[in-house]
Curated annotation (Swiss-Prot):
Protein name: Small ribosomal subunit protein uS9
Gene3D superfamilies: 3.30.230.10
Any one Gene Ontology cellular component term annotated for this protein: cytoplasm
Lineage: Bacteria, Thermotogati, Thermotogota, Thermotogae, Thermotogales
GO biological process: translation
């Protein structure tokens, strides 16, 4: 049996869903069963990687926890947002004293913005066909 406590969190953003499991450790990062030295390798961008793992930085747990991430759906930006929310929720399960800090940084709110559906008679969700006067 495992002797370390595992804390989990679920996060969603656009069409992405992320499940994060954190265990006390030395900062090992595993995303979709692949071990990465840094989040930038997966997200291919420093900004998205920093955004996704910001909860660890804000709570001073960067490098102190092993993070296991399962993320699917959407693109890299949506996945980064999903990981961020899931990680924040997992940190709160680990230690409830992190809640005010994470809440003040806006990391506990699920971003409700979704892609608007295309309507019939239009070219896109709101883009109408070009109007011809004559």
């Amino acid at each position: 049996m495992m002797d370390k406590a595992i804390f989990n969190g679920l996060g969603r953003r656009k069409t992405s869903v992320a499940r994060v499991y954190i265990v006390s450790g030395n900062g090992k990062l595993t995303i979709n069963d692949k071990i990465f030295a840094s989040a930038e390798e997966y997200f291919k961008d420093r900004v998205r990687a920093r955004h996704a793992f910001e909860p660890l930085v804000v709570t001073n747990n960067d490098g102190k926890l092993d993070v296991f991430v399962r993320v699917e759906g959407g693109g890299l930006s949506g996945q980064a947002g999903a990981v961020r929310l899931a990680l924040a929720r997992a940190l709160i399960k680990m230690d409830t004293s992190f809640k005010p800090v994470l809440k003040s940084h806006g990391m506990l709110s699920r971003d409700p913005r979704m892609v608007e559906r295309k309507k019939y008679g239009l070219r896109k969700a709101r883009r109408a066909p070009q109007y011809s006067k004559r």
